[in-house]
Amino acid sequence: MTIFDNYEVWFVIGSQHLYGPETLRQVTQHAEHVVKALNTEAKLPCKLVLKPLGTTPDEITAICRDANYDDRCAGLVVWLHTFSPAKMWINGLTMLNKPLLQFHTQFNAALPWDSIDMDFMNLNQTAHGGREFGFIGARMRQQHAVVTGHWQDKQAHERIGSWMRQAVSKQDTRHLKVCRFGDNMREVAVTDGDKVAAQIKFGFSVNTWAVGDLVQVVNSISDGDVNALVDEYESCYTMTPATQIHGEKRQNVLEAARIELGMKRFLEQGGFHAFTTTFEDLHGLKQLPGLAVQRLMQQGYGFAGEGDWKTAALLRIMKVMSTGLQGGTSFMEDYTYHFEKGNDLVLGSHMLEVCPSIAAEEKPILDVQHLGIGGKDDPARLIFNTQTGPAIVASLIDLGDRYRLLVNCIDTVKTPHSLPKLPVANALWKAQPDLPTASEAWILAGGAHHTVFSHALNLNDMRQFAEMHDIEITVIDNDTRLPAFKDALRWNEVYYGFRR
């Protein structure tokens, strides 16, 4: 069972009574056939639920009102099978607060050249019925997605499925609670921000809990539960000699397991699905949570270090979006560069907290090593390299008057050498279009040093996310040129300033 099983998407057909009962009967039959086929053949993440035809303003308004108040409804897919006068949709669309997708399709793929008549034309009017619906969306300045293609087309299936992931993610975000253990890293700017504005814009809440409250829960974990979890570690990971039974760091592994169990219990009891820590506020914990955070991220929790609640929330959102897809998604940080003409590279990592969902190795190494930051006992961590291939790094920043999402398309590569003195998980990548352009554009746009790294999601996914939440997106990819990029930043400043 996944989070998508908790939601459904309503399939709504727009028509009118002008064409008579026989046409409406055929429309209903077509809709039933299409919905059944999509549910069985399209591999959509959510179930489509066919609703009664929308043929009058009252019927359409009722559907939109019911969608708003049904917690299982993640959004609406609308198909204008015949012409459906768009003034009938105004009241419903005015109140609709769920995501909306217009499926611009028709029942038949090919025209029946020898038999086509006006009855056929009246029945299959997506071509201009969809344009009428599009006008009222534009007139009302209402954001909605449009997918064009035959309902049996795999590309259309994939695009609808991708939109469904965004719709479910948006509903999950409205209920998301972010727990901050301690505050921000002192004097850091980009990890701070307006939590009230974030809740108004996205729906997630951010609150702080004392580390001492967490420590109480950690200390209540039984030795039996700790030992059972360590047994799981031994089956999932390659344990270094120091972490094995009778190893000199075995106690550190036991403490890491206790922290993991305590953190998970605290988060579950509070209904949290994202959290932050900071190495400057560890009072009562015996080590910086490293292994615990890595494993919780792999279970779907959002996380970021140093109190960075925006990145923690974004990671949770992207975890939901990517559920069931190939490839992982993790907290990440641009750490250091490798400058080599024609082969500039970025080494991404963090002190400890990189999600093993992006690991290249089937069994990461579990080790305990010294960490100078934090002033605590040596922490346990998983060590691995990252899968290779196309990926993205994304950053959500607070500009005061708006939120900006930055996305850099990257290509992860194999680490060419071992890193015997760097016992942390890492990712190595080439930034698009090149490191100088990518880094300069990122800096000019104010991108954070913390990001969400993903092999599972792509630029189109993040564009949909930005559109659905009505926020600015700034893209750095192979098409980026700095002069045009700077112009786009200036234009966006005017556009979003005008909208205030």
Swiss-Prot record:
SUPFAM superfamilies given in the database record: FucI/AraA C-terminal domain-like, FucI/AraA N-terminal and middle domains
Binding site for Mn(2+): 306, 333, 350, 450
EC number per UniProt: 5.3.1.4
Pfam families noted in UniProt: AraA_central, AraA_N, Arabinose_Iso_C
Metal-binding is among the record's keywords: yes
InterPro entries: Ara_Isoase_C, AraA_central, AraA_N, AraA_N_sf, Fuc/Ara_isomerase_C, Fucose_isomerase_N/cen_sf, Lara_isomerase
Reaction it catalyzes: beta-L-arabinopyranose = L-ribulose
GO molecular function (one): L-arabinose isomerase activity
GO biological process, one term: L-arabinose catabolic process to xylulose 5-phosphate
Pathway where it operates: Carbohydrate degradation; L-arabinose degradation via L-ribulose; D-xylulose 5-phosphate from L-arabinose (bacterial route): step 1/3
Cofactor note: Binds 1 Mn(2+) ion per subunit.
Keywords: Arabinose catabolism, Carbohydrate metabolism, Isomerase, Manganese, Metal-binding
GO annotations of cellular component type: cytosol
Cofactor(s), names only, from the UniProt record: Mn(2+)
Function: Catalyzes the conversion of L-arabinose to L-ribulose.
Protein family: Belongs to the arabinose isomerase family.
Assembly mode: Homohexamer.
Name the UniProt record assigns to this protein: L-arabinose isomerase
Designated gene of the protein: araA
